């Protein structure tokens, strides 16, 4: 049984024959990125670097970000979100599996009308957490103040991107709120449920999907 990253045949433009390359390298060339783990510094630098590079290479063609993540660090998630708002191409965010905590924050960062959830995906939002309980009292107070600022900032973004009133989002974030794809669409976290898109494009060219998949 093969171990490691799968390899697939890929013909580099200009070459006569295809060569076997890592699957993810092929996907990157097709402007398709994956957030499939906890959001930490390494994966954040990886994704943001690719977004910037792809934007420099082609500032028009869309980028596709598939998300299946339990969430992770606040600052790392905000870094991905801010990069998505900065690069020039539109970014599709596509949730498959789960987008929880900061992963749901990344999900709503996609271009409006281009945020998608697969039919059986689960989306969860809640308030930011911290390990402040380990700190001494002065540090505790400073961290609580900073956490409050971050929470307010994140709540404002959710409210802006979903169209919900600030107070509604703030109350919902007091607890873990899990949603189905349809519930997430009704809430404003995503714009389209995946099966709706399949129905819409079943008799037409799937322009919403990466070029490499159109002949599959």
UniProtKB/Swiss-Prot annotation:
Function: Cleaves peptides in various proteins in a process that requires ATP hydrolysis. Has a chymotrypsin-like activity. Plays a major role in the degradation of misfolded proteins.
Enzyme Commission number(s): 3.4.21.92
Residue numbers annotated as active site: 101, 126
Name used for this protein in its record: ATP-dependent Clp protease proteolytic subunit
Parts of the chain that traverse the membrane: none
InterPro entries (UniProt xref): ClpP (IPR001907), ClpP/crotonase-like_dom_sf (IPR029045), ClpP/TepA (IPR023562), ClpP_His_AS (IPR033135), ClpP_Ser_AS (IPR018215)
Enzyme class: hydrolase
Matches recorded under Pfam families: CLP_protease
Catalytic activity: Hydrolysis of proteins to small peptides in the presence of ATP and magnesium. alpha-casein is the usual test substrate. In the absence of ATP, only oligopeptides shorter than five residues are hydrolyzed (such as succinyl-Leu-Tyr-|-NHMec, and Leu-Tyr-Leu-|-Tyr-Trp, in which cleavage of the -Tyr-|-Leu- and -Tyr-|-Trp bonds also occurs)
Any single GO CC term annotated in Swiss-Prot or TrEMBL for this entry: chloroplast stroma
Source taxonomy: Eukaryota, Viridiplantae, Streptophyta, Embryophyta, Tracheophyta
GO biological process, one term: proteolysis
């Amino acid at each position: 049984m093969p171990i490691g990253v799968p390899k697939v045949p890929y013909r580099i433009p200009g070459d006569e024959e295809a060569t076997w390359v890592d699957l993810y390298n092929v996907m990157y060339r097709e402007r398709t990125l994956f957030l499939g783990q906890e959001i930490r510094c390494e994966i954040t630098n990886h994704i943001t670097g690719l977004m910037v590079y792809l934007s420099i290479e082609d500032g028009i063609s869309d980028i596709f970000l598939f998300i299946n993540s339990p969430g992770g660090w606040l600052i790392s998630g905000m870094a991905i979100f801010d990069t998505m708002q900065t690069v020039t191409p539109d970014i599709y965010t596509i949730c498959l599996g789960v987008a929880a905590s900061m992963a749901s924050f990344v999900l709503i960062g996609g271009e409006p009308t281009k945020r998608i959830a697969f039919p059986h995906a689960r989306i969860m939002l809640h308030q930011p957490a911290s390990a402040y309980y380990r700190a001494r009292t002065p540090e505790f107070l400073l961290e609580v103040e900073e956490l409050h600022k971050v929470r307010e900032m994140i709540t404002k973004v959710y409210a802006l991107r979903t169209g919900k009133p600030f107070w509604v989002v703030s109350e919902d974030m007091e607890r873990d709120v899990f949603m189905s794809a349809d519930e997430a669409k009704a809430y404003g976290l995503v714009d389209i449920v995946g099966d709706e898109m399949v129905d819409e494009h079943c008799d037409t060219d799937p322009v919403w999907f990466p070029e490499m998949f159109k002949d599959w």
